[in-house]
Design a protein with these regions (language model features):
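Alpha/beta catalytic cores of nucleotide-metabolism and tRNA/nucleoside-modifying enzymes
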Residues: 2-135
Length: 135
């Protein structure tokens, strides 16, 4: 991985997993097909600013919306995405793919920032702790 010097990734994992109902979040993987999401009205990831989680960008030059944790209430709920998946609606995999790609783009940006700041070891430790917490 990155700690060993790998600096480029080319993989279908984010899109394939999204189409099959597995979504990546800061706190672990979320399986949208799980019945517990049927009535869950929070976004996939409350810290995420992608279109699926946070809705439309704020402002004309914004590239992302406002996360749930930052007070935003746009985006789509886990319950709605669960419903889209269960009924085979094409919007479901489109939104989940947007989310997974945003997650990976943001993760790589955070890693580059940590490397530039000489804080990759701290970033890596926090990343592992967050993922171990669970969704």
């Amino acid at each position: 991985g990155i700690a060993a010097g790998v600096d480029m990734f080319d993989c279908v994992m984010p899109t394939r997993n999204a189409r099959n109902g597995t979504l990546f979040t800061r706190f672990g993987d979320l399986k949208i097909r799980n019945a517990r999401h049927k009535t869950d009205h929070q976004p996939l990831d409350t810290t995420c600013t992608c279109h699926a989680c946070a809705g439309k960008p704020s402002g004309p030059s914004g590239s992302a919306g406002v996360s749930w944790d930052a007070g935003g209430r746009g985006g789509f709920s886990r319950a709605y995405l669960h419903h889209l998946d269960r009924c085979g609606e094409m919007l479901g995999p489109m939104l989940t793919t947007i989310h997974n790609l945003h997650y990976y783009l943001n993760l790589m940006r955070e890693i580059r920032d940590a490397l530039d700041a000489g804080q990759f070891a701290q970033f890596r430790a926090q990343f592992k702790a967050d993922r171990a917490r669970g969704v």
